[in-house]
Amino acid sequence: MGVCGYLFLPWKCLVVVSLRLLFLVPTGVPVRSGDATFPKAMDNVTVRQGESATLRCTIDNRVTRVAWLNRSTILYAGNDKWCLDPRVVLLSNTQTQYSIEIQNVDVYDEGPYTCSVQTDNHPKTSRVHLIVQVSPKIVEISSDISINEGNNISLTCIATGRPEPTVTWRHISPKAVGFVSEDEYLEIQGITREQSGDYECSASNDVAAPVVRRVKVTVNYPPYISEAKGTGVPVGQKGTLQCEASAVPSAEFQWYKDDKRLIEGKKGVKVENRPFLSKLIFFNVSEHDYGNYTCVASNKLGHTNASIMLFGPGAVSEVSNGTSRRAGCVWLLPLLVLHLLLKF
């Protein structure tokens, strides 16, 4: 309902009918603009929702009566207001100009407005079209989503506005990779862990600043041990074995030696777990502690393991792809003693 959708005062009903006859603007009859040098209304008027629209009509001293109409309903006739909408006010009524203002414009105000005048000869009309622009607004967007690696996802971002806004999707974290879609819908087939992170939906139509919303996409995948560190430690010293694993959800770690799980606090051993890292700490290394240890990382999607060596001084540990193995030992002191015995 536009500015014309308000009731008229009952005592003016007869005058309304008279004015319609006077100005010859019956409902449904098209009105042409520019049939004469006057009245001359503005070209199309474009305003943003919430702003004020001024409708001006240029006239001259030959005019005896003048009115502004919204479609076929009179808003103002001369100085008299026929519309009860408080947003419609008279700005000027002079020999050269007849203007009204519609305040706090809304989308239902959009449409044709007619300036109608009466001269000594016959009525004349001129029309202007009011265009209402609306800032973009995102009315529907997908919720944050958690999905297993390899599955397909579809993200939705619905926006309204006048003109119709352009919607774009962009992957912004963990690192920006530019625009990935210029559509309301973003389809990702066989999603990978690298495609996790925040996705930004932007709606713009040049009426106001773009509107931005974000969706967080979490990609779940089984653990992958990216680093497994063995170490050489003398007897009686502190030693640490490290196992680092990438996983979503975060991996849970367990340590084993000779197929037996190591329990924290037993035999001077401590297990220190963080979301992506586990440490097996020996406070006082003994000969019995040397050997091969297994780090197991697991989450709800799977598990993996790596072999890590704790060795003594002089031993060489070869580490590859999260596993370590003993390559050999060279004990320098026994060789030196043997050399001295043979010499003498």
UniProtKB/Swiss-Prot annotation:
Any one annotated GO CC term: plasma membrane
Domain Ig-like C2-type: 39-126, 136-218, 222-309
UniProt signal peptide: 1-33
Native source species: Homo sapiens (Human)
Domain of life: Eukaryota
PROSITE patterns for the chain: IG_LIKE
Family: Belongs to the immunoglobulin superfamily. IgLON family.
Name of protein: Neurotrimin
Subcellular location field: Cell membrane
Job description of the protein: Neural cell adhesion molecule.
Disulfide bridge map: 57-115, 157-201, 243-295
Alphabetical UniProt keywords: Cell adhesion, Cell membrane, Disulfide bond, Glycoprotein, GPI-anchor, Immunoglobulin domain, Lipoprotein, Membrane, Repeat, Signal
Annotated propeptide span(s): 322-344
Lipid linkage positions (GPI-anchor amidated asparagine): 321
Keyword Ligase recorded: no
Lineage: Eukaryota, Metazoa, Chordata, Craniata, Vertebrata
One GO term (biological process): neuron recognition
Keyword Oxidoreductase: no
Primary localization class, coarse: membrane
Gene for this chain: NTM
